[in-house]
Amino acid sequence: MIERFMRNDKDRPSARDGQQNGTNDDSYFVKFLHWIITLDTYDGSSRNYGRMTETTNYTFFFGGRVRTVTKTSVYSIVVFAMFIVPLILFSIFECNYLWHHKGTNWKPAIVILYYFYLLTICSFLRAACSDPGIVPRNVHIPDLNASYKIPQEYYNYAILPTKNPNASVSMKYCQTCRIWRPPRSAHCSVCDVCVLSHDHHCKWLNNCIGKRNYRFFLEFLMASTISCILLILLSSFRLSYSPQVRYTPVSLLIICYCGLGIWYPLILFIYHIFLAGTQQTTHEYLRSIGSKHPIFHKITRNRDSPYDRNSMFFNLIHLWFQERGWNLVDPRRKQHYPADIRFRKLPEAHSFETV
C-alpha cells in the first residue's frame, strides 16, 4: 500500500507548486513518508536517498539514518525478538519481587542487568543498521569513451610492499564495483558493495560486518552473553525463594531459555576475540585455512601478517579503540547528482571485450 502510494505521489503537486498556486496539499505528509522509508527517488525532497538504491541492495529509513538489506530473510527481526522476550518476562514476573526483597538487596544487580540489555539493544542496532564501511563505486574506470572497457592488466593482483620483508599486501580489482579494492576489503554479493576490512556478512543482523561496525558486533555478543548470565542468576535466586517450582514457572522458563540461548553468542564472541587478537578477519582466516568450517580448525597467528602487533592485548586494544573512519558513501548528503558516475550501476565485465 505504501509503495503504491509513493509511486502515485510523483503525479501530485509539489510543495513549491502548491505555494505558487496558493493551494494546500499533502506534500509534507509525503515528505514524512519518504523520510520514514525510501522506496524511490523523491523529487520534492531536499535530500535524495534514492540514488543509493540503484547501486546497492540497501533500503534506507528515517532520513538515511537506518539501513537494511532488501530481498533477504528476516532473521534480524527474529534475533531481536528472541533477546527481548526474556527481558519482558523478567520485568513482568520477576523484577518487582527481587527489587522489594527484604533479605538481600538485588537492586544493583537489576540495574546492571538493564544496563547491559540497553547496551545489547544499542549495539545490535548499530551493527545491523549502520554503514559497515562501504567503498564508493566506479572510481577506477580507465576509459569512459571506450564503453568502460577494462584493460587486461586490471585482472591481475597488485602487490604492495610492507615493512615486513616476508609479508606483502595484495589489491584486487572489483569488476562489479569498478574499483581497486583497498587492502583487507572484499565484495559482498548479498549487499552488492565492497566493504573496508570486510569480516563477513552476518545473516542474523542482515548486514555486513566491516571496519565501521565490527566493534558494535563484538559489543553485541559480549553484552548479550552477560545479559543471559545475569538473567540466569537472578531467576535462580528468585526460584530459590519459592517453596515450590509451580509457584514461579516463569523463573524456570527464563533459566532454561537463557541457558540454551547463551551458547551461540558466547562461542561466537570467544571465536572473534581470538581472531581479533591475531589481527585476522573471518574472510582472511577462512581463505588461509582453505575451509568454510572454521570450528574444526585451530586459530593460529600469522607471524608474517603486516597488521599483527605481536600482542593479543594490543591487537584487541587497537581494534576496540581505533577510529571508525569516514562514511565514504553517505546517504544523508544534500544531493546525489544523477550525473555522478559513482552512483551509476555499470554492466559487469566478463571478459576483456568492450562491455
From Swiss-Prot:
Membrane topology per record = Multi-pass membrane protein
Q: Which positions are catalytic residues?
A: 202
Q: State the similarity comment.
A: Belongs to the DHHC palmitoyltransferase family. ERF2/ZDHHC9 subfamily.
Note the subunit structure.
Interacts with ERF4.
The molecule here is called Palmitoyltransferase ERF2
> Positions of the region Disordered?
1-23
All copies of the DHHC domain together span 172-222
Task: Return the InterPro entries for the record.
Answer: Palmitoyltrfase_DHHC, PFA4/ZDH16/20/ERF2-like
Cytoplasmic face residues? 1-72, 130-215, 271-355
Please give the start and end residues of each transmembrane region.
73-93, 109-129, 216-236, 250-270
Cellular compartments per GO CC:
endoplasmic reticulum membrane; Golgi apparatus
Task: Quickly give the catalysed reaction.
Answer: L-cysteinyl-[protein] + hexadecanoyl-CoA = S-hexadecanoyl-L-cysteinyl-[protein] + CoA
UniProt keyword terms in alphabetical order: Acyltransferase, Endoplasmic reticulum, Lipoprotein, Membrane, Palmitate, Transferase, Transmembrane, Transmembrane helix
What UniProt notes about the protein's domains is: The DHHC domain is required for palmitoyltransferase activity.
GO BP of this protein? protein targeting to membrane
Where along the chain is composition biased (Basic and acidic residues)? 1-15
GO MF entries: protein-cysteine S-palmitoyltransferase activity
Q: What is one Pfam family matched by this protein? A: DHHC
* Stored PROSITE patterns: DHHC
Q: What is its EC number?
A: 2.3.1.225
Q: Sum up the protein's function in the record's words.
A: The ERF2-ERF4 complex is a palmitoyltransferase specific for Ras proteins.
Q: Which residues lie on this side of the membrane: Lumenal?
A: 94-108, 237-249
PTMs? Autopalmitoylated.
